[in-house]
Amino acid sequence: MDTIGYHYVVEAAGCDPEVIADPNKIREIFLEAAKVGNMEVKASYFFKFSPMGVSGVVIVAESHISVHTWPEKGYAALDVYTCGEKADPEKAVDYILEKFKAKYAHVSELKRGIEEEDSTFTHTILTWEEKLDRRNGNK
């Protein structure tokens, strides 16, 4: 079966706590990430927890971008899932990590789509730590 979509599951650490504690800032980042990744925004919702933390989602025609943050730990759990040919989820992920000022990230890329007659499917694990280290001036 052809791939239906690409799902990036991202562990982002060393993020700027002020950025990932602000639902309005995250919404702004996600809306721009959708544009950078050539996605069509349909809706968005973000919720700020007390005393801290944000969960949110941007629904795009191609699927979604979502987040759960722990500012006290500098940590964000991100999902970027797209289907179709025109979207570039990797660009969206890279943009979000840059704006979150993530120092470390583990990115798992899952090729989505399996039919009943398919007996196996594979997932590829990617790590972008080296790229983040270079961007943060550590190499």
Swiss-Prot record:
The keyword Transmembrane does not apply. Binds 1 pyruvoyl group covalently per subunit. One of its GO terms (molecular function) is adenosylmethionine decarboxylase activity. Pathway: Amine and polyamine biosynthesis; S-adenosylmethioninamine biosynthesis; S-adenosylmethioninamine from S-adenosyl-L-methionine: step 1/1. The modification Pyruvic acid (Ser) is found at S63. InterPro entries: AdoMetDC_C (IPR042286), AdoMetDC_fam_prok (IPR003826), AdoMetDC_N (IPR042284), S-AdoMet_deCO2ase_core (IPR016067), S-AdoMet_deCOase_pro-enz (IPR017716). It comes from the Archaea. It holds the Pfam family AdoMet_dc. The record marks E62, S63 as: Cleavage (non-hydrolytic). Its EC number is 4.1.1.50. Keywords: Autocatalytic cleavage, Decarboxylase, Lyase, Polyamine biosynthesis, Pyruvate, S-adenosyl-L-methionine, Schiff base, Spermidine biosynthesis, Zymogen. One of its GO terms (cellular component) is cytosol. SUPFAM superfamilies: S-adenosylmethionine decarboxylase. Its cofactor is pyruvate. Belongs to the prokaryotic AdoMetDC family. Type 1 subfamily. Heterotetramer of two alpha and two beta chains arranged as a dimer of alpha/beta heterodimers. NCBIfam families: SAM_DCase_Bsu. Catalyzes the decarboxylation of S-adenosylmethionine to S-adenosylmethioninamine (dcAdoMet), the propylamine donor required for the synthesis of the polyamines spermine and spermidine from the diamine putrescine. This is S-adenosylmethionine decarboxylase proenzyme. The lineage of its organism: Archaea, Methanobacteriati, Methanobacteriota, Thermococci, Thermococcales.
